[in-house]
């Protein structure tokens, strides 16, 4: 069940950034660095209970993070 949900989140995240897997990898990497440095999550997920990668993917899938917004935060 969780695998299906993760796959659908990744599919939605890819759709939100134009189906570019390399861009998704880069966005997730940068966002995980930000979260690790103390940035607040933009979704209702506790970083102590969830993997930062999962949080970053959900943020992208929900449209809260994209290439323009990630550049502003760096």
Curated annotation (Swiss-Prot):
Pfam annotation, one family: RNA_pol_Rpb6
GO MF: DNA binding; DNA-directed RNA polymerase activity
Main enzyme class: transferase
GO BP annotation list: DNA-templated transcription
SMART domains xrefs: RNA_pol_Rpb6
UniProt entry keywords in alphabetical sequence: DNA-directed RNA polymerase, Nucleotidyltransferase, Transcription, Transferase
Enzymatic reactions: RNA(n) + a ribonucleoside 5'-triphosphate = RNA(n+1) + diphosphate
Task performed by this protein: Promotes RNA polymerase assembly. Latches the N- and C-terminal regions of the beta' subunit thereby facilitating its interaction with the beta and alpha subunits.
Subunit note: The RNAP catalytic core consists of 2 alpha, 1 beta, 1 beta' and 1 omega subunit. When a sigma factor is associated with the core the holoenzyme is formed, which can initiate transcription.
Name of the protein this chain belongs to: DNA-directed RNA polymerase subunit omega
Lineage: Bacteria, Pseudomonadati, Campylobacterota, Epsilonproteobacteria, Campylobacterales
